[in-house]
């Protein structure tokens, strides 16, 4: 049940990427593997990221051509994630695929809380949660969904229908089962809103459960690269 892998796209944000990787590897329910996709970074430190992290559960997939060059439409983070998604399907992994942007960070119990919430309920093939908004200086400014200080009465929420009108899924908290990934195919390089496009399509195939407890720090106000 708790078998999952993590996909982290990155470009030229080495220190932030290290933080994201470590937050995934140190989960109380650890992932089977963390896949980092380097989108042709100019930073030479990415060459040694496996050695610096020192975990056999880390795999770095390196793109020779950046998504910007490939698509001609800015940084297409979905295109970068697809590298890992295809790899996961190719090796026959059966379980959950979790997404984490390189400037975001998980709380240590993030995966455990989500798995406890869904239990054996086969209705939900996508899991997500609330998150704390945090600026690049580390200042927390509130909840991403709702208002900080307001009591959340529901511990979980079915957000499947909401996904048709707005995006209730914070991508860096999302897990999707590999069975749904296979049916969805690639994330589409549609520019702004490609995350929402992915979850909209997923909502037609499966239920989406959101844990209302914040389980990640979501970076706002960072102008570089992959903040969507």
Which residue ranges define each predicted feature?
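N-proximal low-complexity "stem/linker" segments adjacent to membrane-targeting elements
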Residues: 1-23
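Short, acidic, metal-binding catalytic loop of nucleotide-sugar glycosyltransferases
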Residues: 22-31
